[in-house]
């Protein structure tokens, strides 16, 4: 899983459509749709909070380095957040909140700056 490129790969209209299909029925959304929605949301996070202080991982779909501040240049970043696709999309759309996901163990965060509270919900519906 490599960090997202600096250029968008998913056209925003297609990404929003994938997110809407997922929102309508998360359990019935095809895997390819979930993948597109996750990647679109990661690209959107990168676009709104560029930087290299924090790495957000949503395996197996993607990862992005974002948020301004001290950056790392080698190895594992000091600030990492990892979660599954359902948790990521729930957070992005406002269907769950950061504190609840962290307390519930569906988000794994390590590092002093490993938080997304200032950036969520990213794409509320």
Question: What do these predicted regions represent?
Answer:
Residues 1-125:
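Feature captures hydrophobic
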């Amino acid at each position: 899983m490599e960090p997202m490129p600096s250029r968008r790969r998913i056209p925003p209209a297609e990404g929003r459509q994938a997110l809407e299909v997922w929102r309508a029925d998360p359990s019935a959304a095809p895997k390819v749709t979930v993948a597109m929605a996750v990647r679109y949301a990661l690209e959107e996070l990168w676009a709104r909070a560029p930087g290299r202080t924090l790495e957000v991982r949503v395996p197996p779909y993607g990862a992005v380095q974002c948020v301004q501040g001290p950056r790392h240049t080698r190895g594992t970043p000091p600030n990492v957040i990892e979660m599954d696709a359902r948790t990521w999309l729930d957070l992005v759309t406002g269907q769950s909140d950061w504190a609840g996901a962290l307390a519930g163990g569906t988000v794994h965060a390590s590092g002093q700056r490993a938080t997304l509270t200032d950036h969520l919900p990213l794409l509320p519906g």
